[in-house]
Amino acid sequence: MKKIITLSITFCIWINFYSQNAYAFFGSFNRDKNKEGIYVYKLDTISGKLSKVTSYTGVLNPSFLTLSPNGKYIFACTESKTKNGGSVSSFEFNPENKSLKFINKQKSGGENPVYLTSDKSGKWLVNGNYTEGSVSVYPISENGKIEPLVQNLQFTEGSVNPGRQERAHIHSTVFTPDFNYIFFPDLGADKIRAYQFNNESKEPLQPAEIPFTKTTLGGGPRHFTFHPNGKFAYCIEEMGGAVSVYGYENGKLNNIQRIYTHPENYKDEYESSDVHISPDGKFLYASNRGNEDNIAIFSIQNDGTLKTVGYQSVKGKHTRVFGLDPSGKFLIVTHSGSGTVVVFKRNPETGLLKKVGRKIKINGVSCVQIRKY
């Protein structure tokens, strides 16, 4: 009997250890600050089921979220195409009592903020403004408060598409794995801009030795990610419908491949959006909107190049952002067009995806970030 009890206790401890609390944070285009804007769901790390925990009402269009390194604070872009209407906001999340509390906000320093990220020290927040083509840098205090901006980098030049590239359009702000540099894919200029980063400086961003890398003309670089080994980087091109692969070393990018995210017979307009790599570094996932509404799946070779594995319907409309949970077991897709969220279970051997559970309804959902606590 004692042996059975001991085994039961051990099993319960094992289940508890491998069922750490994981939470999915969703941003949205709520169009009205008197409606829910940020949502928090608990992710069952065994079944993939999402259960609503809390939400926040009182913020307009928190379309993109990022978390502080310790997961205590959530930062949101509050998107606005009105001159000086955008802002960046800070919230505190308490996983013990499941609460989400507003801390403060600052002006975004440019029109239409769309992406922001925190450095590993948690002392700095970097925001990209799409329409105005600028980047704003903010100190973060120990209590999660966003201080007034200390740098505002403005870019102007456009590229070959007069309808989409009349000027610079910063679409993401991504640190290198060592946090010595940060890259800004500029959809409007067909460039990936590079800056050195020093978290001890009062103005932490300075131009890199190579200030930008040119991308395919008319491709429109959008989102950007690094391989876990830090040797390779991947940029998805919204208008080019492709992922460009780069070798990376000390702030420098070297293009080694460009591969389409659509089947060869695809003839419609490209609307590629987001890109992520599985935690084990074996597979890359790229989302396509428009008539495709799918995720392209690629295997990653030893030299960083990609091979197409297949395509998975996202079971919804207009996938702006998706995310992988820290274990790599689940991939969560947001559909801003249909206002739905779908969870897929990932096969770690093949990279293929299988829908699990039911769709979650979140009006205007546009972003997801996932973290274990």
Model-inferred region functions:
Residues 41-48, 91-98, 138-147, 195-204, ...:
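Short loop/turn segments immediately following beta-strands, especially the blade-tip
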Residues 51-57, 101-106, 157-163, 208-214, ...:
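A short beta-strand motif characteristic of beta-propeller blades
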Residues 98-172:
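Asp-box/WD-like beta-propeller blade repeats and closely related beta-sheet repeat scaffolds
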Residues 33-34, 59-69, 109-120, 156-179, ...:
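Beta-rich, blade/repeat-based domains predominating
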Residues 30-33, 79-84, 131-134, 189-191, ...:
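Short glycine/acidic-enriched loop and turn motifs that connect beta-strands
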Residues 20-44:
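An edge-strand/N-cap motif at the start of beta-rich repeat modules
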Residues 1-24:
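Bacterial Sec-dependent N-terminal signal peptides
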